[in-house]
Amino acid sequence: MAESLRMVGYRSVALTIPTAILNECSRTLKECFAQVGLETVSRIDLTCSNRYELLKLLRRFRNQYDVVSVKCTNQNVAAIACRDRRVDVVFFDPNNRKMKFTHTLARLLNGALELNLSFLLDRESSDALNKAMRQMDVAREHRVKVVLSSGCTSPKMVRSPMQLRAIGVTLGLSEAQSAEAVSSVPSSIIESNLERRSPLYIEEGVRLVGRSELK
């Protein structure tokens, strides 16, 4: 997997690591990817049934992971996830016909909307594709940040950054938006969170400055 990702042009990847093995396996996984020249960041996907569960998990895991994403299973969870600045990415299950990325949610969203292409490529029905195109329409109208990810779990599912960009344009994003969705948007999320986890970080816009930096 690591070699396949490197060969198609990736320089860094986000690894979705279950909480049960975070401390035990994350170092080993990072070493495997580092051997082929890939940087890695840890990611957690939160799936919650209500706002209280989501807030509890955010308090527990925000500082343990580089990227926090939330699956929007219902309107209450979606609204909280879009508003809460601790959430980096929200995504919607294309099989859940009751949940849509609406104009209201777009106005609330502080993070980014993720489109996982494995959901599209693994479906014979056109429903998932139509839903993804509607999401991109809303995102484009409200200038929402978008992340395009391959969601690959095997080498066969790996898609190059260029392929992701092409799919983004097909779904309705502009060339510039599609390029940002596979480069600058995910990069800015990672950089911001790495800074937030730094011992020099106090709060948004405030950090400790050493004497050497003042000279």
Regions found by a protein language model. Name each.
Residues 1, 45-47, 67-71:
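Active-site mouth loops of central-metabolism enzymes
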